A protein has these predicted regions:
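Conserved "HGTGT" condensation-loop signature of ketosynthase/thiolase-family condensing enzymes
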Residues: 1-76, 100
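Conserved beta-strand-centric core segments of catalytic alpha/beta enzyme folds
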Residues: 1-22, 119-170
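Conserved catalytic cysteine-centered active-site region
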Residues: 36-55, 82-136
Length: 170
């Protein structure tokens, strides 16, 4: 019998602070029209000081667990895609693992910027197909607002903060 991976549950977390393009007009040589015509972006969410990458990832993970009707200890592994970890080490994935109270399995980060979640999902799929895990929490979480150059209009208008999570199951 062929093992297939399916998405069993999903969740997300967006910080409360919403920043629309007009806020950038005050500090940069730009306009809502310039930003939206080039990027399609009208608004983005920015994390506050307490909303770290691992905190947002944990909140998205809890929502995914609830959506899948699973408990945290049902999870065999966590793969977290991020380029904005809270610390150099430990990995953000192990911080989420601890936040959820998971004491078994493995957890690691994937750092591939925009493609990170896709790579994390591909990793999880391969682990499930190979029989190494049955339920994997795959998360993408970023806090780019904490490291952006606020004077570079070509980049600072593009990024926001948030987290999304899925549970991939055999």
């Amino acid at each position: 019998m062929t093992v297939r991976a399916v998405i069993q549950g999903c969740g997300h977390y967006l910080p409360k602070r919403v920043v629309d393009n007009s806020e950038f007009e005050r500090t940069l040589d730009t306009s809502d029209d310039w930003i939206s015509s080039r990027s399609g972006i009208k608004r983005r969410h920015f994390a506050n000081e307490d909303e770290t990458t691992s905190v947002m990832a944990t909140l998205a993970a809890k929502e995914a667990l609830a959506d899948a009707n699973l408990r945290a200890d049902d999870i065999d592994a966590i793969i977290l895609a991020t380029s904005t970890s809270d610390l150099t080490f430990p990995s953000a994935a192990t911080m989420v693992q601890a936040n959820l109270g998971i004491v078994k399995g493995f957890a690691y980060d994937v750092k591939a910027v925009c493609a990170g979640f896709v790579f994390a999902l591909a990793n999880a799929n391969a682990l499930i197909i190979s029989g190494q895990a049955k339920k994997i929490l795959v998360i993408g979480s970023e806090t780019f607002s904490k490291l952006m150059d606020w004077e570079d209009r070509s980049t600072c208008v593009l990024f926001g903060d948030g987290a999304g999570a899925v549970i991939l199951s055999a």
